[in-house]
Amino acid sequence: MKVIAIAQFGGPEQLKVMDMPEPKPAAGEALVKLEYAGINFIDVYMRSGHYARSHTYQTPLPMTIGMEGGGTVAALGDGVRDLKVGDRVAYCIVRGSYAQYAAVPAWKLVRVPDNVPLPVATALMLQGLTAHYLSHSVFALGPGHTCLVHAAAGGVGQLLVQLARLRGATVIATAGSAEKAAIAKSRGADQVILYRETDFREAVMTITGGKGVDVVYDAVGKDTISRSIRSLRRRGLCVNYGGASGLVQSVEPLELAEAGSVYFTRPHLADYLATAEELQGRAADLFAAYSADQLAVAIDREFPLAEAPAAHAYLEARNTKGKLLLEVPE
């Protein structure tokens, strides 16, 4: 089968089309014939070596890239009872989705409802589940809360804005252009700050009457994290869940104290999908919201599998206005 793999860490040029044997599902696994693979910043971090020392997301070389996919069940390993060959499924947080086939633990597969297109289901896995755990668990938003969402026109950002509004929160969003601001606004953001024209921290304080927000969801990282911390209300929470501008290497404890005894966390999605019940519950919420026309899923571009290097370059240039997918050939 064809895969996109790396033999060494580095830039997008390290992504190569390779031939690998088709995997055989072990006991408790299902073989998935992939039609789509999601493209995410976690793929960039793994490709570049940022996660080389991670225990949660291990990166042995050589390595087939990709942590999210959608397709149909092609075969079942021993002991798998809840799936059948031909089921449409999607999944995330299993390495190796930039491929024609993947062997996936059966409990990590989500059966896709008939009314949900497979590209949408794939797009809702890593990014949708991220938006869900951020808004429902890391800081459980509700009426009366105000949140700041960075990169609100991106794949996670658009979903996070919508879920926050569904939970009754007020959303302040940041965007890098008028076009992206319009996207964030269309998804329900109450206020949008053009961060290239305005200091977002000053704007947040103006909007909130000097109080700050309850929670900041920051996927930008290095360029924004200090101002994100200082955009919080007293005892607020800064959630750093990505590093589009570079990974955050450290945060000084005194900085948190001086910002108003605020809190800081850097969560992993895997820790919020630790059981089948948690995974299936979050996915069911997302599919239900999509089916009720309460959650719009924007797919920005679909690249052929062989164009994975171009797809990574596009993602890293921070040009995205929604989800990026790879189309996997037959």
For every predicted segment, state its role.
Residues 93-106:
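A structural motif shared across PLP-dependent enzymes of the aminotransferase-like
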Residues 223-294, 327-330:
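Glycine-rich phosphate-binding loop and adjacent beta-alpha segment
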Residues 84, 88, 122-198:
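Mid-domain Rossmann-like dinucleotide-binding core that forms the NAD(H)/NADP(H) cofactor-binding site
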Residues 292-301, 309-330:
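C-terminal capping/lid region of NAD(P)-dependent oxidoreductase domains
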Residues 35-36, 76-78, 94, 152, ...:
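Short, surface-exposed secondary-structure boundary micro-motifs
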Residues 70-94:
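A glycine-/small-residue-rich N-terminal strand-loop-strand element
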Residues 11-13, 20-70:
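N-terminal glycine-rich beta->alpha transition that marks the start or flank
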